[in-house]
Amino acid sequence: MTTNEQKKRIYLSSPHMSAEGYEKAFIEEAFATNWIAPLGPNVDSFERELAERVGVKAAVALSSGTAAIHLALKAVGVGQGDIVFCQDLTFSATANPIRYQGAIPVFIDSDHTWNMCPKTLKKAFEKYEAMGQKPKAVIVVHLYGLSADLDAIMEICREYDVPLIEDAAESLGSLYKGKQTGTFGDLGVFSFNGNKIITTSGGGMLVSNDEEKIKKARYWATQAREPVRYYEHKDLGFNYRMSNICAGIGRGQLRVLDERIAKKKYIFDYYKEHLSDLEGLEMMPIQDYDDPNCWLSCIILSTDRVKPTDIIEALEAENIESRPIWKPMHLQPYYQNCDFITLQEQGSVSEDIFNRGLCLPSDTKMTDEDLAKVTMVIRGLWG
């Protein structure tokens, strides 16, 4: 066994089950009642409880956040050849469903918030309007739990009468001006992947105050099966429903969401207190309107003395997980031929954040001793 393997692993953001065993209780109930297949009482309850928590009229539990984005695009009418404006600085799961629908993504650069720049979004609308074209939808992301500048973005979408989809996969519990992100646009998306602030092992949720859109999404997610005795399908459907077992995990996790948010914020504040004095190191930006869940605590460097890769390698040598900021979509080989809109004459804001940024371990099971170890390793690079 190597020295590194002997050291306790400190994770970026791993699943964290409740100490009370809420998840296990819901799963055991599902086994006891033989509700093992997709759909069931846990699914119904999880949808209702999540909708109540975030403050929307309707929600549908799905197999992933990616599935939720796909059905959101379908629900607003995105189809073959349509244009969709999409935040550039994000994970590929935000953009890929655009291609599932045969649509064309146009990537929008970020600003100081790390999220979609409203001025760049406006520039994109003006460019395509001059060509006689208009996007069918806009997808904004609340990156790492940081709220986008929603008022400005929504105003532009209303001006051009284009639906707004919020990718809130990383921002459950983040508040924009006191209200949950993911509930401002026409549709919102949450993710319960294993590394998210709460998990269902794998899963997602599509939410909206438009109950008809959620009803339609539920229909598509269940293979578009018609409500008749025999199997009849008038539309193309998908196998996107969440299992009753996974929903049971989600119900248990929802009961400790506030605890998880509090710990994520504690981790962010710890790093801020113990690292902010280092020359050329800044914490990710939090705006006055924002109350983020701090899903991942990120930093950005403005020094030639230490590179993000130096920190990643130094932490990994101590068996501590960290990772780079998401690689922007316009730099991805698959999307290299897609249009990219930026206000910069050279380079882009998203590329700069990618080059200089870093996600620090933000696992809610971390102890103060773990946090002290992380900060000690990082501080050591400054000498």
What role is predicted for each listed range?
Residues 101, 159-160, 318:
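Helix C-cap/helix->beta junction micro-motif
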Residues 2-3, 41-48, 56-59, 119, ...:
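PLP-dependent aminotransferase class I/II
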